[in-house]
Amino acid sequence: MSGGGTNCENIIRYFSGSDRVHVALVIANKPGIPALEKADRLGVPTRVLPKADLNREDVLLPLMREYSIDFIVLAGFLLVIPDFLIREYDHRMINLHPALLPKFGGMGMYGHHVHEAVKASGEAETGMTVHWVSGKVDGGEIIAQFRTPISPAWASPSSWRPRSRAIRTRLRGATATLSVLGRSR
C-alpha cells in the first residue's frame, strides 16, 4: 500500500466472512498511512517495509512465507514489483489499475496523473482494469475491466473520484474472487 487504503479496506471487508480467502497481511512502504490504520482497525496484521527492503528477496520472501501468503493483490501500491516476486507469484498476483489498459498504463500512470491523461486524450469513457502482474509495468494479461462514460459535467479529473470509487467497489469483489478462486495456470 502506498496511500489512502480505500481499496485495501474494501477488499478486507469483502473477504471478512469468507471461509476460503483470508487477508493475512497488508504491506506498505510508508508508515502512518490510512491504509495501515484501516487494516489494523479491521484486525489484519500490517508491516512497513522501506523500498530497499521490498526489493530484497532475502527480506520479502521470508515474510511472505511467515504469513503463508498464497496470492497478492496490489491495491494502490505504486512501486515497481521486483522480478523475484513476480516469478514466485506467477499468476498469483493481480494489480488494480485506475484506468483502461493498455491505453493508459505504464510508469507514471497512477492517481490523478492517469485521470488527467484520460481527460486530455478526449476519450469518451474511463474505467478500471484488473490484470495479472508481469515484468512490464501494467503489461500483464487483463482479467477484467469495468467501463463508465465520461460525463461532460466532470470538469476535471478530480471530479471523477466518486464515480471511480463506485467502479472500484464493483470491480474488487468480482475480480478478486475470480482471480483467487477460479483461475489457475
Each language-model region and where it sits:
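One-carbon transfer enzymes
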Residues: 1-185
